[in-house]
Amino acid sequence: MIFNRSVTYSNARLPYSKRSLYTKTRVLFFLKQKILSRVTTKMAIADLDKQPDSVSSVLKVFGILQALGEEREIGITELSQRVMMSKSTVYRFLQTMKSLGYVAQEGESEKYSLTLKLFELGAKALQNVDLIRSADIQMRELSALTRETIHLGALDEDSIVYIHKIDSMYNLRMYSRIGRRNPLHSTAIGKVLLAWRDREEVKEILSQVEFKRTTVHTIGSTEELLPQLDLVRQQGYGEDNEEQEEGLRCIAVPVFDRFGVVIAGLSISFPTIRFSEDNKHEYVAMLHTAARNISDQMGYHDYPF
């Protein structure tokens, strides 16, 4: 017998024998659902055990995170039962997630809960989606005006990451890809992302940077870079003058969020044979117009350039 949960059954109106049968049937139905759920979970765990160790560990972590997300706080015993893992395995994963800041344990309590770090990651992803959507039109207009490679880059720990790109219309052009990382110290976008940050924060970030020289023009130390960052902030744009790659020039400007924080750099990249110093300020003006429009859409209406 199959019960439709949208229908309300009045047990009190049935004769005693039928009420008893009805109750037993309902109990059997829900027991069946519970058993099926456990069987499905066991099958999933069995499949998980067949995975390579690295994949299996990742799946277990996400299983624990999902279970933690269903409760305000939960103990190891109950959590291990839910994810069908041993308590020692669950404890080991919890301690790792706790050290990374994704899980909290209140004092001496044996209860664990999720922190807001996952929310912060989601918020960053959402911000990047909004940023890319807002930037795309401006980047395409820049591409149409200059015919050169246009990049949007963001800070990720000690590097820049290209989060959007419009390719040059020329055959001779800068080759890159979305998701590619480049150094902070030798790129125009990197300098822009650092220039508007607090000096102590910049020093902390740069302490993790390996100042690798890729050309004779590459900046080789924090002491050499800091005065350049002051100039970048003063003039409103950063430059890569063959510092990352021989034969390549780049100009970048800042993009601000609604709080006035620089969240990205917008750039034009040129082969040196197509770059003219006489036209540099025209390119800077184009970039500022585009970055101002993007910043405005991100909620910042006081673009300084």
Swiss-Prot record:
Keywords: Cytoplasm, DNA-binding, Repressor, Transcription, Transcription regulation. Disruption phenotype: Inactivation of the gene results in constitutive expression of genes of the polygalacturonate degradative pathway (pelA, pelD, pelE, ogl, kdul, kduD, kdgT, kdgK and kdgA). Gene3D superfamilies: 3.30.450.40, Winged helix-like DNA-binding domain superfamily/Winged helix DNA-binding domain. GO terms for cellular component: cytoplasm. It comes from the Bacteria. GO terms for biological process: negative regulation of DNA-templated transcription. Residues 131-300 form the IclR-ED domain. The keyword DNA-binding applies. InterPro entries: ArsR-like_HTH, GAF-like_dom_sf, HTH_MetabolicPath_Reg, Tscrpt_reg_IclR_C, Tscrpt_reg_IclR_N, WH-like_DNA-bd_sf, WH_DNA-bd_sf. GO terms for molecular function: DNA binding; DNA-binding transcription factor activity. Residues 55-116 form the HTH iclR-type domain. Residues 76-95 bind DNA. The keyword Transcription applies. NCBIfam families: PRK15090.1. Transcriptional repressor that negatively regulates the expression of genes involved in pectinolysis and in pectinase secretion. Controls genes involved in pectin catabolism, including the pectinase genes (pelA, pelB, pelC, pelE), genes involved in pectin catabolism (kdgT, ogl, kduI-kdgF) and the outT gene involved in pectinase secretion. Acts by binding directly to KdgR binding sites (KdgR-box) in the gene operator/promoter region. Homodimer. This is HTH-type transcriptional regulator KdgR.
